[in-house]
Amino acid sequence: MKKYLLIIAALLGSMVMTAQNMESVKITHGPWLCDMTENAVTVVWKTDVPATGWVEFTENHGQHFYSEEHERVYDARFGRRLTHETIHSVRLTGLKPGTNYMYRIFSQALTGWGTSDDARLGEIASSVVYKKEPYGFRTFSNDTDELKFFILNDVHGRSDDIRRLCADVDFSQYDFVLLNGDMLTTTENEEQIFSGWLDACVDMFAKNVPIVYVRGNHENRGQYADNMYKYFPSHNGQFYYTFDAAGISFLALDCGEDKPDSDIEYHGILESDKYREQEAAWLENEIGNLRYDKRIAILHIPAGNSTWHGDIHLHNLITTLLNEAGVSLMFSGHTHQYAVRKAGELADFPVLINGNRTYASVTVKGKKIHVEVIGETKEENHSLDFQFR
C-alpha cells in the first residue's frame, strides 16, 4: 500500500511541476529587428513555450521608458492575437521617418484552453527597462543623402567568426546590417539558426540595428529551411522586396539554388527555375514603382559570374532588368572570394563580391559610395569608390 501511495504522490508532484512550467515563460532568443522602412519595422523574438507576444514603444526624447503609458501592439493575424506560437513577430507601423524609438517586448504563457476562445494565460516575461536602457532603433529617412550600412555573407554557421571578425565594430554607426546569404550551410532545425549566426547578431547589434535579410542558395537546403520566413517576415510576403533609405531604392533579390532543379542533390523538391521566373515578373513590374533614381541591387549569387546553371539563369532573367532599372552597383557573395566585376563585365553596373571571411562597410554621401572591405589580415582589406549614375 505504501508503495502505491508513493507512486501516486510522485505522479501528483509531476503534475504540479508540469502545471507550474506551463504557467511560466522565458524569452530565450532575441529580439531582432528586420524589414525596416521609413515608417515601419518588425520586431521578432523567441519564447520557450507557446505564448502571446506584444511590443510597447515610444519616441525616445531622453525620457524614462515609463514616463507614460504605451499602446500594446500584439502579434496578431486576421483579427486574432496569436497564442500558440513560440516565434513572435510584431509589425510596428505609423512611425516617423528618421526618428529614434525605444521599445520593450512581452510574452504571456498559454497555460490551457477551454471551449471556444477561452484561452488561459499565465506569467509574463519581458525585456528589462529598469536597470538598463531599453532597446531602441532609428527609422530610415529619405530626407538625407547620407547612409551607412554593413555587409556579412557566407558565414555558413561560423558564429565564432562573426564575433571575432566584428569584435571591434561599433554597430551604432550603421543604419542597417545586410546579411547577404548563406548564413548556414543547411538548415536542419531551429537551434542551428540561433547557434550558427542569429544569436551572435542579436548580441552584437540586431536588438537596435535592423537586419536586411537576403537568402543565398544554401538557405534552400535542409528540412527546416521552409520555416525561415517566420524569422524574417517581409512587408510583401516574399524573400525578394524593395525598400528605400537615404533617397536610394534598394532591390533585395532572391537567388534560388545554383544547380539545375533536377540535380540529385535536391531529391526532386526544388523549383528554383519557376521561382526565379516569378521573381523576374515581379521585378519587371516593380521597376516602374521605384521611388528614387539612385538604385542599388542585392543578390547573393553574382549573376553571370560563372557557367553554373543558377548563375546563367539569373543572368538571363535578372541582369537585363537591372540594367533597364539603372542600377548603379550590386552587392553579392557566394564565391567565398573577394572580387570586383567592373561595369560592362557582368552588367552595365559594377558588382562587388564580398568574401566569406570579410565584412564590407559601406558609406554613402551624395552621389558617392565608399566601401571598405575588412578581413583579419591586411591582405584582405580593400578600399573602393563608386558613384551613382
Regions found by a protein language model. Name each.
Residues M1-M22:
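Bacterial Sec-dependent N-terminal signal peptides
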Residues T18-I151, S172-Q173, H370-R389:
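Acidic, histidine-bearing metal-coordination/catalytic regions of metal-dependent phosphoesterases
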Residues F106-G136, Q192-E284, L317-N323, A339-V373:
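Extended active-site neighborhood of metal-dependent phosphoesterases/phosphodiesterases
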Residues D145-Q223:
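Conserved, compact domain cores that house catalytic/ligand-binding motifs in diverse enzymes
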Residues E146-L147, D175, Y240, G247-I248, ...:
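Alpha/beta-hydrolase fold active-site loops
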Residues F150-N153, F176-D182, P210-N217, I296-H300, ...:
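Active-site neighborhood of phospho(di)ester-bond hydrolases with catalytic His/Asp-centered motifs
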Residues G157-I162, T185-E188, R215-Y224, D258-S262, ...:
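Active-site environment of divalent metal-dependent phosphoester hydrolases
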Residues Y266-H267, S272, G288-M330:
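Active-site-proximal segments of metal-dependent phosphoesterases and phosphodiesterases across multiple
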